[in-house]
From Swiss-Prot:
One GO biological process term: protoporphyrinogen IX biosynthetic process
Name this polypeptide is given: Porphobilinogen deaminase
Keyword field contains Transferase: yes
Cellular component aspect of the GO annotation: cytoplasm
Note accompanying the cofactor annotation: Binds 1 dipyrromethane group covalently.
Residue(s) carrying S-(dipyrrolylmethanemethyl)cysteine: C241
Organism: Wolinella succinogenes (strain ATCC 29543 / DSM 1740 / CCUG 13145 / JCM 31913 / LMG 7466 / NCTC 11488 / FDC 602W)
Cofactor: dipyrromethane
EC number: 2.5.1.61
Cross-referenced HAMAP family: Porphobil_deam
Length: 311
């Protein structure tokens, strides 16, 4: 195979990610030609509705997966946090890349932190997970849906539509957005637990394909272990990408730690827990922590969270 086609979404961040994968593949495999094919997903087309109300799984991946199965593209580059925990039969995550900074990031032109926002300040976010944790800290804050690409979100912040917005620090780093507004402050994971898979790229392709073999050079063992625990936790809970679940695993030596949060989007109820295990037991760790939260009522909380999101 001397040519492969990568499917990618068309946002600046998605293209940065696809170009990174393209460069790594061409560097590692002499004579390989890599082409990018831009694909609009359902999540890209519906911008006037909060993601949770759009509903369904694979909002940013399904069209890319269908094109892979039809042979129109050889692989897709995803933000791993957007990839459903159950993949379509015949497809696999051939590589999970080294993680960028996993933290969420606070951006504002006027205020230096969530704590210093005035009463009733308006915070823009795409995520029920972020909204849940913001409201659990500051129930007075007004969290509102903020859709669109990163540049659109920052533009709306600068125009005064919001007092602050929350983005992923990984995206801020990749697009070098540190000087876009006055305050760009990563939020400690003890304060806001990230989404499963946050800051890693997931490379998806057909099982046993040549693309699978070629993309092995992108695999990061640490990221694979951490995100396996996170994704297994969400899978057992039967939560999708658009429900208020935080899951952050991190390796320290031979020990894998996992901390999680599940609750209602308004932050009025939230379950948090953490557990550790040997690094070779990522799946068990995710399952065990999910079972603990299910015993505390997590599935019922998520059912209520979905109802609230659709109101």
């Amino acid at each position: 195979m001397n040519k492969i086609i990568i499917g990618t979404r068309g946002s600046v961040l998605a293209l940065w990610q696809a170009e990174y994968v393209k460069a790594e593949l061409e560097r590692a495999h002499e004579g390989l030609s890599v082409e990018l094919k831009i694909v609009k997903t359902k999540g890209d087309k519906i911008l006037d509705v909060p993601l949770a109300k759009v509903g369904g799984k694979g909002l940013f991946t399904k069209e890319l997966e269908e094109m892979m199965l039809q042979g129109e593209i050889d692989l897709a580059v995803h933000s791993l946090k957007d990839v459903p925990v159950e993949l379509i039969e015949g497809l696999t995550l051939s590589a999970i890349t080294e993680r960028e900074d996993v933290r969420d990031c606070f951006l504002s032109d006027k205020y230096a932190s969530l704590e210093t926002l005035p009463l009733g300040a308006k915070v823009g976010t795409t995520s029920l997970r972020r909204s849940m944790q913001i409201k659990s800290m500051r129930s007075d804050l007004d969290t509102e849906s903020l859709r669109g690409n990163v540049q659109t979100r920052i533009k709306r912040l600068k125009e005064g539509d919001f007092d602050a917005i929350i983005l992923a620090t990984a995206g801020v780093n990749r697009l070098d957005l540190w000087k876009e507004v006055n305050y760009v402050i990563p939020i400690d994971t003890e304060m806001m637990i990230p989404a499963m898979g946050q800051a890693a790229l997931g490379i998806e392709c057909k099982e046993g394909s040549e693309a699978f073999r070629l993309t092995q050079i992108l695999e990061d063992k640490k990221a694979r272990i951490e995100t396996t625990a996170e994704r297994e936790f969400v899978r057992v809970l039967e939560g999708g990408c658009q429900v208020p679940i935080g899951a952050n695993a991190y390796l320290e030596g031979e020990t894998l730690h996992l901390k999680v949060a599940v609750g209602l989007p308004d932050g009025s109820e939230i379950l948090m827990d953490r557990l550790s295990a040997p690094k070779g037991e990522a799946v068990r760790l995710g399952r065990e922590l999910a079972a603990r939260l299910i015993a505390k009522g997590a599935r019922e909380l998520l059912r209520r969270a979905e109802e609230m999101a659709f109101q």
